[in-house]
Curated annotation (Swiss-Prot):
Signal peptide residue numbers: none
The protein, known as: Large ribosomal subunit protein eL21
Family listed: Belongs to the eukaryotic ribosomal protein eL21 family.
Entries under InterPro entries matching the protein: Ribosomal_eL21, Ribosomal_eL21_arc, Ribosomal_eL21_sf, Translation_prot_SH3-like_sf
GO CC list: ribonucleoprotein complex; ribosome
Region (Disordered): 1-21
One of the protein's GO biological processes: translation
Stored HAMAP family: Ribosomal_eL21
GO MF term set: structural constituent of ribosome
Pfam families documented for this protein: Ribosomal_L21e
Key words of the record: Ribonucleoprotein, Ribosomal protein
Amino acid sequence: MVKRTHGYRYKSRKLLRKKPRERGLSGLSRLLYEYKPGDRVVIDIDPTFVENAPHRRYQGKVGVVIGTRGRAYVIETYLGDKKKILVVTPEHLKPHQGGS
């Protein structure tokens, strides 16, 4: 028997899928939105952009913008009780609408 591979996008068939009305590229407002350090953001993976997408375990996580790296943002988030630092491009981020 051959061992089954577990790639980077393993078990993401339903998670990284767009609804029929969302197909194609996202609007420019999502790409051009400027985040400042201290802003809270939601990591929302856009399956259109595969190369620079964060891992699926961070889908839906809320983080805080620490700074920028090129055109990407450095995000601090928690995975369980561990602090994680992610470098995420704007197409995979949206502003957090929650209270505090």
